[in-house]
Amino acid sequence: MGWQNPPVPWREIERRLSDRPAEADGGDSPAWSRKREPYVAPPSIAAAPPARQHHSSVPYAELHCHSSFSFLDGASHPEELAEEAARLGLEALAITDHDGFYGVVRFAEAARAVGIATVFGAELTVDKLDISPGQADPDGSHLLVLARNPKGYATLARVISEAQLAGEKGAPRFTMSDLDRWASPDELNDWLVLTGCRKGLVPRTLEREGPAAAARALGSLTERFGRDNVAVELWDHGSPLDTVRNDAMVDLAIRAGVEPVATNNVHYANPNARRLASAMAAVRSRRSLDEIEGWLPAMTSAHLRSGDEQARRFARYPGVVERAAELGLACAFDLSLVA
């Protein structure tokens, strides 16, 4: 009779005697692979974290950022985003991929190595009716949710799982009425909801129906999630209409007693990735680059920016950049707390 234990290699014996943490064996992590080595920060960044190469005089955290795990939408790996955030001197970085937490493990590992505080969230697709592939501009509204703490992360993970199970591959089914069944009002207090990009409920209503309807849409969010748990998102990608929209959004925020906050609605780490992002958009829509050109943004703007850059862009809205840093640090926690 024997225990049939496998042989223990000397390196494992040495690790145990040295009291070093165990190396991950993958478990059920979607980010783990025997072919993927543990993340090692570039020497220029790892030399002296949390010091940054680019010292920004204005504190800032990016709260709306898509990685390559937003399939054919984000153009940079989580590690690239964390590294660029460190170079720019950001206080914190949120990864908000579409309808899932697919890249959070890789993001957390890289951010920990480069000294960036981590915020976890997702951009949920609401009321998507047409799930056919190849759309240049897919339908459905977006709800941007950040977890304030590990409890909020667990609630958001459960809601995402329910939506994925209720839908089909690549097309989770999520409505606001579903949210009432999947999460209690107390659990929603552990979320911070941003009004989101142009497909967010409030900006989309503002564009299509005007300020009065947008005010009602914002009121529906504050009624559901609580005024203190909603922030009005401003972004500026250089379009002439961005300032017009931001002026209207700030006015809505003031009237509703909700704080406005700056983001850059990031889809790639730096301007060099813009061409890759355009190619991905063409692949997603099953069009050539010539055919998709009219749908693409005119400016190379959806990349990470420093606090100084954002402060210049949002000079007409004092405090919105600094408020992003405050919210980012308030929502930041290490992913190890979830395990």
Regions found by a protein language model. Give the residues of each.
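Phosphodiester-processing cores and adjacent nucleic acid-binding clamps
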Residues: 1-339
